[in-house]
Amino acid sequence: MLIIAGLGNPGSKYAGNRHNIGFMAVDAIWQRQGFSSWSKKFKAEIAEGEIAGERVLLIKPQTFMNLSGEAVGEAMRFYKLAPKDIVVIYDELDLIAGKARIKIGGGHGGHNGIKSIDAHCGKEYRRLRLGIGHPGVKDLVHAHVLGDFAKADQAWLSSLLDTIADNAGMLVKGEDSQLMNKIALATGGKPDAEEPQAPKKQVGQSHIHKARNAAQPKKLPATGPMADMLKKMFGSKGD
């Protein structure tokens, strides 16, 4: 069994936030892979299903970001799983918008949701980081992370979410390199591109208060089933 946890903040107020891209990714998998209806358990919304012959639990913690580990840890212990049986999907300022990276273990990078999961589950779980870019100025980071994606972001965002949902079997089977290649090709990146070097992080700061290298997302054609959902989500919002 595998737990796939998407991180975000609960409620319609935060639904379109960049910080909620983890929720969006899990919603896309749920929509594409034919899971059960969402229900409430473990301080979270959960749905059960099967991907690539493996039983999978999708989970969206409803504790708010900083306490995400309470929900994921409770589910892990209930099903008698180990950190290796968990995949966490979340936003990453260190990555250009639309890029993705996956790894096992590592530091929390100032992300309070990851810090909480580390505390409740240990560190040796898989982390799928989805780039949301950086606004370029430290003072704008908080508003950027807790602000909605702009209409101009919908094309790459739709492609990214579609690709994750379509290739969820790769995520479940641990075919990480293949999945990264699929995402890079779908979002206009280079499959083997080297991840840019991030500046040294300051201890004790939340990632929404850090200054990081600025990078602008590419505009891509809006295609795929997720496009309509995103248009509904952001249609009434300005850029």
UniProtKB/Swiss-Prot annotation:
The record marks 9 as: Discriminates between blocked and unblocked aminoacyl-tRNA. It is found in: Cytoplasm. It comes from the Bacteria. GO terms for cellular component: cytoplasm. The active site is at residue 19. Belongs to the PTH family. Monomer. This is Peptidyl-tRNA hydrolase. It comes from Sinorhizobium fredii (strain NBRC 101917 / NGR234). The lineage of its organism: Bacteria, Pseudomonadati, Pseudomonadota, Alphaproteobacteria, Hyphomicrobiales.
